[in-house]
Amino acid sequence: MMMLDDYIAKSKLSESLTSTVWLAKHKLTGEEAVMKCFDLSKLNRNLRDCLNNELEFLSSVDHPNIIRLLHVSQDDDFLVMVLEYCDGGTLSSYIQRYGRVEEDIAKRFMKQIGAGLEIIHDNHIIHRDLKPENILIDGSGDDLVLKIADFSLARKLHPGKYLETVCGSPFYMAPEVLQFQRYNEKADMWSVGAILFELLHGYPPFRGNNNVQVLRNIKSSTALPFSRLILQQMHPDCIDVCSRLLSINPAATLGIEDFPFLGRIKNSRVWVKDTTFSSRQHGTRERKVATINGRLQFDLSQDAYLPQRLLENLMYIYNTIEMARVTGVPTSYLISRGESIKVLSQLLRKAKQKTWFFQMLRSWNLNKELMKVQLYVGGFISPTYSFTYSSITSNILINISNDIYSHC
């Protein structure tokens, strides 16, 4: 039986080429913990850097949705980390046991994952391996607490910088990672979108036997592969979030700063405002969330972000149109009840004051119906003016998005 200071290893949980994980117990209190023992001789320079990043980050944070580091010990041959023990297993085992979950549970889980990820990204860390297996559950019943764990692939990533190493788990890897392109923290957000989709469906959105097959399935999809039955039961805001997290264009992928679950929760089928959120357990920082009628109000005060916002919301509408075409769900229902059409209205009202917007508007080759939509949501014409969404084509929206992207 392995011993370390105040902890005794009881039973082996797992073993890899570089480490062994034990279930441990504190000798005095009897409190259970997890002991990870690393063989330093088997760690290359890159793995040592990742381990150092993990230790540096975990030793500096104390947040209920991030696994807690209790103790570290090192000699010439081994390094041992003692982490808190979560008796609820992993989110993966939870999904295997219970299958898909209801939206209110998924949103509650997403709020906790988002809270932990906000701290991670605020510390300029990219996790790179977010998946249900690396999210631990503590507690039982209605008091489940989710904790992001396993930072073995995490790296420091300062603003404006990118990574290029391909790593992670294929079902949850962003397409830019799978394509050997450079990536930033938005890759973590794609992983969160895949987890949200799996919570709602019981399986990941894109699967395959290897990275190539997963990427091929992503690129060949004209819409997110929602189950038609489940899609009919989903709140439009939930469809909105899935579409914006799982955008194949990283520039259009929802960022943690706009992650809606940090500012609103679902009660029955109504989004309810949650005006404050304490990002750290001991209240070292507080995130204020402005709301309009209980809904998240996006910050439109910074002109520099205007093209980016337009791009994100137009790409959502594009994804929605494609989804409607495949599933047969009326496009007008998805768009008119979705959050993005309301945000797009705010954005266009602000954009119409900009010279570049008018130049772009004149350059677009729009059909009459689409022009009516643009003028309506932009506040140029009366909302009583009739129009239909059916004539908005994907190609037109792609062209619009490309124009806006050039201003980002």
Swiss-Prot record:
Its EC number is 2.7.11.-. Gene3D superfamilies: Phosphorylase Kinase, domain 1, Ribonuclease H-like superfamily/Ribonuclease H, Transferase(Phosphotransferase) domain 1. It is found in: Cytoplasmic vesicle, Autophagosome. One of its GO terms (biological process) is autophagy. CDD domains: STKc_ATG1_ULK_like. Keywords: ATP-binding, Autophagy, Cytoplasmic vesicle, Kinase, Nucleotide-binding, Protein transport, Serine/threonine-protein kinase, Transferase, Transport. The active site is at residue 129. It holds the Pfam family Pkinase. Residues 7-272 form the Protein kinase domain. GO terms for cellular component: autophagosome; cytoplasmic vesicle. It comes from the Eukaryota. ATP binds at residues 13-21, 36. It is an enzyme of class 2 (transferase). Serine/threonine protein kinase involved in autophagy. The ATG1-ATG13 protein kinase complex regulates downstream events required for autophagosome enclosure and/or vacuolar delivery. PANTHER family: SERINE/THREONINE-PROTEIN KINASE UNC-51-RELATED, SERINE_THREONINE-PROTEIN KINASE ATG1T. Belongs to the protein kinase superfamily. Ser/Thr protein kinase family. This is Serine/threonine-protein kinase ATG1t. The lineage of its organism: Eukaryota, Viridiplantae, Streptophyta, Embryophyta, Tracheophyta.
